[in-house]
């Protein structure tokens, strides 16, 4: 039986992203003093507004929804890895598709919640640039989802299904 090399590669890349997501949800902190010190000499920037937006962004990244999603998605990847090692490639493929849809849901949530945070800017130019940046990131995430999903489904549908062997269990003479 051929190994699903594409799934191994996708799981490795997704594991890196999932570890970064766990780090962002559980370990990252907002340091107001450091941000204030780095923006001290900047001209044309409302430092208090930037700190407010940065604080709300940090709160969004470390919210309970982010933590639960990070744990669930990491658990899905662990399950995919376990089933790949058990040579249950079809089940691993289904679980990975579930992981992909959970990333799509989380990215949609992050985009919609981020739009609310961007509204905290009083300057329309900052709001527009922030909204455009978030939209660009969301589009990139959708494109990556489409690529990963398309390749996974293509190889899943292309391979022959695992059929139980009747030769071993046969009692006919």
Could you describe each region identified by the protein language model?
Residues 1-173:
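Topology signature of small-to-medium multi-pass alpha-helical membrane proteins
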